């Protein structure tokens, strides 16, 4: 005889077996034990929490109860204002010393040589040369010197020579 098809279906949906009182009590005890284990470990605040993470090189863990060692002022202290030091200005050179520095300036000489050779300078270089040449002119006027001193002397000598020739000396 063939088993009926209804029996095969009932095997899959068979009722769950009822638990005994002892099994129910054991499960309740397990749940209670799990519930007690929730949360942080006892004393975790005083112990410093997890010691595994953090500093690797230190042997003794740092006690979190110990605070900062920086002193705290207890009274009202007057504010100490820091005095700003003025930017040190370049030492003032005498006009003669400054003129000598400008005349021996290698960059200025190189740029002037390039100008004499017919090269065109960049705008930045040209403005720098103009500023330096203007400063040289100012210093020479201050000192009572001029570029044309040598040329004037030569012209004066030529005129004197001409005068001598005309006089017949």
From Swiss-Prot:
Q: Where does this protein have compositionally biased stretches of type Basic and acidic residues? A: 20-30, 160-169
Q: What is any one GO biological process for this UniProt entry?
A: ribosome biogenesis
Q: Write out the biased-composition intervals (Basic residues).
A: 10-19, 31-40
**Compositional bias of type Polar residues: which residue ranges?**
49-58
Q: Which Pfam families does this chain map to?
A: YihI (PF04220)
Q: Does the keyword Membrane apply?
A: no
Q: What keywords were assigned to this record?
A: GTPase activation, Ribosome biogenesis
The subunit field of the Swiss-Prot or TrEMBL record says: Interacts with Der.
Explain the purpose of this protein.
A GTPase-activating protein (GAP) that modifies Der/EngA GTPase function. May play a role in ribosome biogenesis.
Name the NCBIfam families for this protein. PRK05244.1-1 (NF003560)
Its name, as the record gives it, is Der GTPase-activating protein YihI
> Which organism is this entry from?
Escherichia coli O45:K1 (strain S88 / ExPEC)
């Amino acid at each position: 005889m063939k088993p009926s098809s209804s029996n095969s279906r009932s095997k899959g949906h068979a009722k769950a077996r009822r638990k005994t009182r002892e099994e129910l009590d054991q499960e309740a005890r397990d749940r209670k034990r799990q519930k007690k284990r929730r949360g942080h470990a006892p004393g975790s605040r005083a112990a410093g929490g997890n010691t595994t993470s953090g500093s690797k090189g230190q042997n003794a863990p740092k006690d979190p109860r110990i605070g900062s060692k920086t002193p705290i002022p207890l009274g009202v202290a007057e504010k100490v204002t820091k005095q700003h030091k003025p930017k040190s200005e370049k030492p003032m050179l005498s006009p003669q010393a400054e003129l000598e520095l400008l005349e021996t300036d290698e960059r200025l000489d190189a740029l002037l040589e390039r100008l004499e050779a017919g090269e065109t300078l960049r705008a930045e270089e040209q403005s720098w040369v103009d500023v330096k040449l203007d400063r040289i002119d100012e210093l020479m006027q201050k000192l009572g010197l001029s570029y044309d001193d040598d040329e004037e002397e030569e012209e004066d000598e030529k005129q004197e020579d001409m005068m001598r020739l005309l006089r017949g000396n």
